[in-house]
Amino acid sequence: LYAAGNHLFVTEDEGNSWKMISPDLTTNDKAKQASSGGPITQDNTSVEYYCTIFTTTESSLEKDLLWSGSDDGLIHVSKDGGANWENVTPKDCPQWMMWNCVETDPVKKGTAYFAGTRYKLDDFAPYIYKTEDYGKTWKKIVTGIPSLHFTRAIRADRKKPGILYAGTE
């Protein structure tokens, strides 16, 4: 079981103990980490705090392959169970992408899909990126999704290789 903040944690004993398995996988931009709410009461939901890992997954095909995406635009991959991490954020990705969902391909090694959004920046375009080489290169794949339907989720069909499902608003 994994849990995340700005670091990724894992438990192997049903939550009795946790081990941090990553460095900070966000931009750690202090300007984005201010307390939210008004001058009298603070917001205690933490929904306005940023620099947080929003999505993470482990590969069902490759042992020790982990992916993470943050709400401040970064994508990281680890091929050794979290001992080492590489920033593989797509070069053509707009700044401050909120990565909402990551999915590994059920049959192709090294392949992952990330769904992101920038609606909080008044950008309602869909953003889905695919890599087939562990994040070395990326391709934006949004053909067929209306231009103002921002993306929240991406899932690969486990029975029909090559079929993807996108969750949009």
Q: What function would you assign to each model-found segment?
A:
Residues L1-E169:
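Beta-propeller blade termini and top-face loops
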